[in-house]
């Protein structure tokens, strides 16, 4: 055991990145401590239960078959999964026209986007052949240059920039958009359900995996409710000042989102490129709401519960009903400007606005849920946004090379630093394992 307060490695953050890093460090025989600001583990994953046992995932919740890192954890811990309900027709509100599939105009644009994304090297997006051009150009400008219809432009803004990046097309570059798509293998692997990113859910909620990961570490490894305020560091180690005391380590893995990592005080200050990466990677803006009903009435109407819309505040809905659940759940998402609009309303008005659109999509029964549950990740002190952070235009080519690079004794892990499935659980696990490997190599060298 290490002497009090000194470890081979301290991990800041107990989300999937931090817990994955801790497991690799412990497996390598390194003394390890995990410091978590929240009173729980899981980071941007949070599962709650209603009084009757209905499961609600308030944060991240889905896994897909090509997400091999998180799938390995599901198998390791014997966590049960179930397919996302998907029988029935999808609704696409396309400029006021009610469709049951993706319009051909959009399918063609998706193919063009996929072809461009294949030109982006996911480990080094700044080295793409047209990186400088694509990083200067916003996705909104690219859409405008396509000469597509107004409704198609609106669809791409809401479904790609909103549904994938939790922002607006005017806020993100073409390069950031293409990198994110390339990291998952294409547009459809990101947007789809069966066989894609939204394929599977976890019995007991996504937080159950994080809980089991934490419990599987040596007793006392994870220290909750103790945010790191300051890190004094040099090439040989670091002193971490927390709300409750201090710790020393030969190496530190900062496994929190860029926005939060940038709020820690560093002495000496971080290099300009590293600090610049923090400042140019704001968190996304999304609002996720759950409407709980006595039964999944939409299924009787031949609907899957999946909807995408170019109008109203809601961009997407999904049937989020767990198996054997006493009640049914429709979950809806607002992104970017629409999410900000909703946040400005009081809870009663938000409820009215959301239910009105659900009623337009699914009929009058959607207007009267038993319960209406929302969770605002922007208001969470130790999150400050969702789904994940993304570079603003110019960020990748100016600061991308610094995103994962260690700074002396400091290493970086979070889904935003992942090469594959960036923004997802899987990317978080990848990043934690990569940072732990860096620490292991540094301490054995």
Kindly give the residue locations of the regions a language model identified.
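Active-site/ligand-binding neighborhood in enzyme catalytic cores
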Residues: 125-227, 235-238, 248, 255, ...
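Central helical "cap/lid" subdomain
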Residues: 226-233, 239-301, 365
């Amino acid at each position: 055991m290490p002497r009090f307060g000194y470890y081979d490695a301290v991990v800041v953050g107990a989300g999937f990145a931090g817990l994955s890093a801790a497991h690799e460090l412990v497996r390598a025989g390194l003394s390890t401590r995990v410091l978590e600001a929240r009173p729980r583990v899981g980071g941007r994953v949070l599962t709650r239960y209603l009084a009757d046992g209905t499961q609600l995932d308030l944060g991240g919740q889905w896994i897909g078959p090509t997400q091999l890192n998180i799938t390995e954890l599901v198998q390791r811990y014997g966590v049960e999964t179930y397919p996302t309900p998907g029988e029935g027709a999808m609704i696409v509100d396309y400029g006021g026209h009610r469709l049951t599939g993706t319009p051909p105009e959009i399918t063609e644009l998706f193919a063009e986007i996929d072809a461009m994304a294949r030109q982006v090297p996911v480990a080094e997006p700044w080295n793409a052949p047209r990186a400088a051009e694509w990083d200067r150009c916003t996705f909104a400008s690219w859409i405008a240059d396509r000469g597509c219809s107004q409704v198609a432009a609106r669809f791409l803004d809401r479904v790609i920039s909103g549904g994938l990046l939790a922002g607006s097309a005017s806020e993100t570059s073409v390069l950031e958009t293409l990198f994110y798509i390339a990291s998952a293998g294409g547009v459809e692997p990101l947007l789809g359900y069966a066989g894609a990113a939204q394929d599977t859910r976890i019995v007991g909620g996504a937080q159950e995996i994080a809980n089991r990961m934490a419990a599987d570490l040596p007793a006392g490894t994870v220290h909750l409710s103790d945010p790191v305020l300051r890190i004094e560091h040099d090439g040989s180690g670091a002193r971490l000042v927390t709300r409750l005391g201090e710790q020393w380590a030969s190496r530190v893995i900062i496994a929190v989102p860029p926005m939060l990592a940038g709020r820690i005080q560093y002495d000496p200050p971080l290099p300009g490129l590293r600090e610049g990466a923090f400042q140019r990677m704001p968190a996304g803006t999304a609002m996720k709401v759950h409407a709980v009903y006595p039964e999944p009435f939409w299924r009787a109407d031949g609907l899957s519960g999946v909807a995408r819309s170019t109008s109203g505040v809601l961009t997407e809905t999904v049937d989020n009903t767990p198996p054997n659940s006493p009640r049914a759940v429709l979950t809806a998402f607002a992104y970017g400007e629409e999410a900000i609009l909703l946040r400005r309303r009081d809870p009663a008005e938000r409820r009215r606005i959301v239910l009105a659109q659900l009623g337009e999509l699914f009929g009058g029964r959607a207007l009267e849920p038993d319960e209406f549950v929302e969770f605002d990740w922007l208001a969470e002190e130790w999150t400050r946004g969702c789904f994940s952070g993304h570079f603003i235009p110019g960020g990748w080519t100016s600061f991308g090379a610094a995103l994962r690079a260690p700074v002396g004794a400091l290493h970086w892990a979070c889904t935003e630093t992942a090469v594959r499935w960036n923004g997802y659980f899987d990317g978080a696990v990848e990043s934690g394992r990569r940072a732990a490997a860096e620490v292991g190599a540094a301490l054995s060298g």
